[in-house]
Amino acid sequence: MRLPLQLSILTLAWVWAVALEIPMSAVVKETLIQLSTHRALLTSNETVRLPVPTHKNHQLCIGEIFQGLDILKNQTARGGAVETLFQNLSLIKKYIDRQKEKCGEERRRARQFLDYLQEFLGVMSTEWTMEG
């Protein structure tokens, strides 16, 4: 009797934790609002120089974006709502890192690779800014 009860409690705790997990899209929206709200505070130190990618395809410049974020975080007074902003940005970085881990998952047949390549090129042709 104890084991089924423990399993039920464990299952209930897992369902509750999943239900409370905030979707990443909500975190991104909240972060955009916080970024707009605290922009003056974040730009108050005019001597800080941050790497700004010249490439318009943001997907290719994630490393540089988060490098600049770390510099900004270290140069900004901590506490309050700004702390929440940096926590959200940290969550977004962790999410992106987890997604990047899926890039080399398994080997497949040539047809499946070509299907993936075709989908990738389709996204590239519609969503990326093409430079001369």
Swiss-Prot record:
Secretion signal, residue range per the UniProt entry: 1-17
Reported function: Homodimeric cytokine expressed predominantly by T-lymphocytes and NK cells that plays an important role in the survival, differentiation, and chemotaxis of eosinophils. Also acts on activated and resting B-cells to induce immunoglobulin production, growth, and differentiation. Mechanistically, exerts its biological effects through a receptor composed of IL5RA subunit and the cytokine receptor common subunit beta/CSF2RB.
Gene Ontology CC: one annotated term: extracellular space
Primary localization: secreted
Keywords: Cytokine, Disulfide bond, Glycoprotein, Growth factor, Secreted, Signal
Presence of the UniProt keyword Lipid metabolism in the record: no
Family, as annotated: Belongs to the IL-5 family.
Quaternary data: Homodimer; disulfide-linked. Interacts with IL5RA. Interacts with CSF2RB.
Stated name of the protein: Interleukin-5
Molecular function GO labels: cytokine activity; growth factor activity; interleukin-5 receptor binding
Sugar-modified residues: 45, 74, 88
Lineage top rank: taxon: Eukaryota
Subcellular location: Secreted
Biological process annotations from GO: immune response
